[in-house]
Amino acid sequence: MWHLVCGDNAVAGVTQSIGEAAAATGLRVLRDDLAVGPLTDVDTPPCAARVAFWQAAWPASVQPAPDFASGLPADARWLAALAEQAQPVTVWHGDSASEQLLLARVAHALEHSALALWEVPCGSGDSRVKTRKAVAMHAPEALAALAQPREVSASRRQALAAQWRAVLADHGLIHRWQAGDFSGEDYQRIDADLLRYARDEAQPLARLMAEAMAHNDGFFVTDTFVLWRARELAAAGALVLSGEPGQYGYMGLQVRLG
């Protein structure tokens, strides 16, 4: 059995739930945050647009940077070959848009396969900031207690695969998951949040980022992504950044309106 999770933070809990032996042979981590950036070529190696997005978004001061040019196409090839092998697949997911997109992506990869697809829902079903839960947000003991695998029905598989096709075609740069469906948008709403919470006086960039991260339902806004948007706004003259990047690429930075 393959067990697929979105991001390294989910590994400890899922490992405790399925056991170390099963994790050693079947746990695979897909690290791409599918909720942000262009998805048009994410399934088509060499995934040039997807790679270019992450290479631009990754803070230069945080090294070593992931090898996006090899890792993202490798994920695409692995998923494309998933239907060719014999092991059934389980996707662990919560209320993260990225986790839900992974589930839809896997359903699409297995759309014409008789291979069994299972899911372990770990969320609340509500993607609002105050109620949402990603897999990694559960303590390992709690995750093991709530994990109830269930096979994905044929009709649900078809619906998920159709959602994935729609996401690839909508050219959205951000995808929110709300009420069981995805909606695509550009970066304007996130950028507007950053400008709304910025002031004429300098403040820690970390504080501004936290404000934007705390007021966005539908997807988990990561520090990597919102830092990139702040850098882009600074390059356009809308924000002014000062100081040295420091830890995580932003802890030493101050920000004010441009």
Predicted features, each with a name:
Residues P59-A104:
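Long, hydrophobic/aromatic-enriched structural stretches that serve as scaffold segments
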